[in-house]
UniProtKB/Swiss-Prot annotation:
Species of provenance: Phaeosphaeria nodorum (strain SN15 / ATCC MYA-4574 / FGSC 10173) (Glume blotch fungus)
Keyword rRNA processing appears in the UniProt entry: no
GO molecular function: 2 iron, 2 sulfur cluster binding; 4 iron, 4 sulfur cluster binding; electron transfer activity; metal ion binding
A GO-annotated cellular component: cytoplasm
Entry similarity comment: Belongs to the anamorsin family.
Protein name: Fe-S cluster assembly protein DRE2
Domain observations: The C-terminal domain binds 2 Fe-S clusters but is otherwise mostly in an intrinsically disordered conformation. The N-terminal domain has structural similarity with S-adenosyl-L-methionine-dependent methyltransferases, but does not bind S-adenosyl-L-methionine. It is required for correct assembly of the 2 Fe-S clusters.
Length: 305
């Protein structure tokens, strides 16, 4: 009997630790064990042979955890590993193994034999009558059992309330046996309900504006997007006109302001701050600083405050 073959799935971090790999080969004989890197299998650089290995062992990372191994053991890699297992083979790792078609066992994840599914038709027959030989459990006063030879029921019909209708669910109404194989004679083909006129009718596509761009209405827009955009443009235009009207200046607004009036300042706003803040053409150059609103008179080049 051939020795069981083992596939060792190694994370890339172990390749930088040869001492760890040597310990692994001390436990597993190289003649019966194959070592493959998980990243090479995930990249498609290594093709695993089909139905070859009895045991697949997922090795831990260099730090003793399985984070890197579980990250690389994705569903497609797990499917490749499951294909390399023999029937009854064991994969000692749970990540994505069940989704790859493996079953859990006390020793690990086992590859079970695939059995083709068989469809079984269900047949529904008539409801069986109670009792034996169609007697419905009825017994005569003398202890004898009446036999129903004509196959019909002898029970009297229940009295129906006046003005009230009900359905007797115990009556099978002598319907034929349902075999589950429906007759297609009563089915209507949906394509027969569509006429040539329906096929030629154009289908109006829904307006679906692209993200990041301004919506544009179709030329023959019927969904109301065109009217909505026109209303938005009109509202923006009205807002802009109102803002423009507030910025217009009249003739009175352009006149020079008299600094002698309380609360008013000159056009430059610095007439009352002294020469250091006055313009070149200011008529008050050389005059001392004065308070806004203070009356200033010039008489024979003398300052009269």
């Amino acid at each position: 009997m051939a020795a069981p073959r083992t596939l060792l799935l190694c994370p890339p971090s172990l390749s930088a630790h040869p001492e760890a790999l040597n310990k692994i080969y001390e436990i597993h004989d190289r003649s019966t064990a194959d070592l493959q890197m998980l990243d090479r299998i995930a990249a498609g650089l290594v093709q695993l042979p089909a139905a070859t290995y009895d045991v697949v062992l997922l090795l831990t990372d260099a730090d003793g955890t399985t984070r890197e191994s579980h990250k690389l053991l994705a569903r497609d890699v797990a499917s490749k590993v499951a294909g390399a297992l023999k029937v009854g083979g064991i994969l000692k790792a749970k990540t994505e193994a069940i989704l790859a078609g493996l079953s859990e066992s006390p020793n690990g994840m086992v590859k079970t034999e695939q059995v083709e599914s068989v469809s079984i038709p269900l047949k529904f027959g008539k409801k069986k009558t109670n009792g034996v030989n169609g007697t419905n459990g009825a017994v005569n006063p003398d202890g004898s059992v009446p036999l129903n030879l004509n196959g019909k029921r002898n029970q009297p019909e229940p009295v129906k309330p006046v003005g009230v209708g009900f359905v007797d669910f115990s009556d099978d109404l002598d319907d034929p046996i349902i075999t589950g194989e429906d007759d297609d004679d009563d089915l209507i083909d949906e394509d027969d309900l569509i006429t040539e006129e329906d096929m030629a009718r154009p289908v109006i596509q829904q307006c679906r504006p692209k993200a990041g761009k301004r919506r544009r209405a179709c030329k023959d827009c019927t969904c109301g997007l065109k009217e909505k955009m026109e209303a938005e443009d009109a509202a923006k235009r009205t807002t802009a006109d109102k803002a423009l009207n507030t910025m217009k200046l009249g003739a009175d607004d352009l006149d020079e302001l008299d600094f002698t009036v309380q609360g008013k300042v000159g056009s430059c706003g610095n007439c009352a701050l002294g020469d250091a803040f006055r313009c070149d053409g200011c008529p008050y150059i050389g005059l001392p600083a004065f308070k806004p609103g203070e009356e200033v008179r010039l008489l024979n080049n003398d300052i009269q405050l």
